[in-house]
Amino acid sequence: LTAKDEVLLYKDAVSKDALFRRLYALYEISRGAKCIVADVEALMQIFPKKLPVLKLKEGEDVDFSSLASRLTAMGYVRSAAVESKGAFALRGDILDIFPVNAENPARVDFFGDTAEKIKPYNFITGERLPLVKELSVCAATDVFFEEGEQRRVKEILFGELSDFKDAA
């Protein structure tokens, strides 16, 4: 478990590898990992109470209409093509996603709200890997808002912005 990089001056805006490794460690802890290797700084930091995980299972229903907003709330970035961890693409009834807790991205074929096939693939070669019955997608961020909190924060920020505009 790595420490969270808090100094903005040193943050690498392009690479989220350290964050994803940290989230993967938290995901494994939530699944009952027996051993944790961490330095004191990492242990002294605040962790989310619960790490959101989206489970996609072959033959089970998911609210497809809210899938994009759910993934975005979990820190995933929507893109035209999935080229790195933390990205997803929706085209018709197909979801391509690269979970931060997976070695490879996967394509999930939907029929309506039902996940029909889950097909991992090698994102470098495009080679199809064996089908899986289930795909766990853990959060790609460690900052979460409860239902309603996001609206409250938005109102506060717009209020502050309005005050700032009035002062100018």
Which residues does each PLM region occupy?
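ASCE RecA-like P-loop NTPase motor cores
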Residues: 1-168
